[in-house]
């Protein structure tokens, strides 16, 4: 028996053990002051340590989160406190991710108190030539949401995708993606529907495109999105385009945002390959 590593949190230890089980490697956990992970077949030590290094780089990667389901067991025998909800949020979200979430919530509350129209007069895309130099308007349309479902859906994806980008690639990269996608998706959407629109979905689609393509072309970046989710995003765009659900969707912003994210991921992955 060879001890591979120790984890302070038993759930993290179990996630790694479950993932290795899906790879055909059996590990066991012994509880002492920490959760010690042991390997019976020492000939596999080098492989396990290599997988451990990748796991420690991004333990929140979906492939690890899904491993417990694939392993097919829930009775681990572990006894530990669950992560508090806000602790789980903090673990994945950096400062930029948090600032955007708080800003969207504050604006949403203001819209409930003051009314949509009053807030849009201050934050909407320039709706009059005299407003074209109020530069914040080219970005603040992304902060406005018109229903609870609208804001919850967008902020969930923003936290999941934006948090991953910020944690792995830095706050600067998330800021650049956000500003460019908000600007260009807003420009396209106002050509489709005029200036009266809002929501973070253009930025969310940019992040979907970016995380998926960057993960496909540059796995070492540490970000990853399952192909099934990007297919879902494309189906949602098609459904919105043909009004299959009878909901008002910012189709122009969705398409433009996705295109921006894919383009930025393509350029960044090319640059990453050149540096190798």
From Swiss-Prot:
Keywords from the named record: Cell inner membrane, Cell membrane, Hydrolase, Membrane, Protease, Serine protease, Transmembrane, Transmembrane helix
Membrane topology qualifier: Multi-pass membrane protein
GO cellular component terms given for this protein: plasma membrane
EC number(s) stated in the UniProt entry for this protein: 3.4.21.105
GO biological process: proteolysis
Transmembrane segments: 94-114, 142-162, 169-189, 192-212, 229-249, 250-270
GO molecular function: serine-type endopeptidase activity
InterPro entries linked: GlpG_N_sf, Peptidase_S54_GlpG_N, Peptidase_S54_rhomboid_dom, Rhomboid-like_sf, Rhomboid_protease_GlpG
Function: Rhomboid-type serine protease that catalyzes intramembrane proteolysis.
Identification of the protein by name: Rhomboid protease GlpG
GN (gene name): glpG
């Amino acid at each position: 028996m060879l001890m591979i590593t120790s984890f302070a949190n038993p759930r993290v230890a179990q996630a790694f053990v479950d993932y290795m089980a899906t790879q055909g490697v059996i590990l066991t956990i012994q509880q002492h002051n920490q959760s010690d992970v042991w390997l019976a077949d020492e000939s596999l030590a080098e492989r396990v340590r290599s997988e451990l290094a990748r796991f420690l780089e991004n333990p929140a990667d979906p492939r690890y989160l899904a491993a417990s389901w694939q392993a097919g067991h829930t009775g681990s025998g572990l006894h530990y406190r669950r992560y508090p909800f806000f602790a789980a949020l903090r673990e994945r979200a950096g400062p930029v991710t948090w600032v955007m979430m708080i800003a969207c919530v504050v604006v949403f509350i203001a819209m409930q108190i003051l009314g949509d129209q009053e807030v849009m007069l201050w934050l909407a895309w320039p709706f009059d030539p005299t407003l074209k130099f109020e530069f914040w308007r080219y970005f603040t349309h992304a902060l406005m949401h018109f229903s609870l479902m609208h804001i919850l859906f967008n902020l969930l994806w923003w936290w999941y995708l934006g948090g991953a980008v910020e944690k792995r690639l830095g706050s600067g990269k998330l800021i650049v993606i956000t500003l460019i996608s908000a600007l260009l998706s807003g420009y396209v959407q106002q050509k489709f529907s005029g200036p009266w629109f809002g929501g973070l979905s253009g930025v969310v689609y940019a992040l979907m495109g970016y995380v998926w393509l960057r993960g496909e072309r540059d796995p070492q970046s540490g970000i990853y999105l399952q192909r099934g989710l990007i297919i879902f995003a494309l189906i949602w765009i098609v459904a919105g385009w043909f009004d299959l659900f009878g909901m008002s969707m910012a189709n122009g912003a969705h398409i433009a945002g996705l295109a921006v994210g894919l383009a930025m991921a393509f350029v960044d992955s090319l640059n990453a390959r050149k540096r190798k």
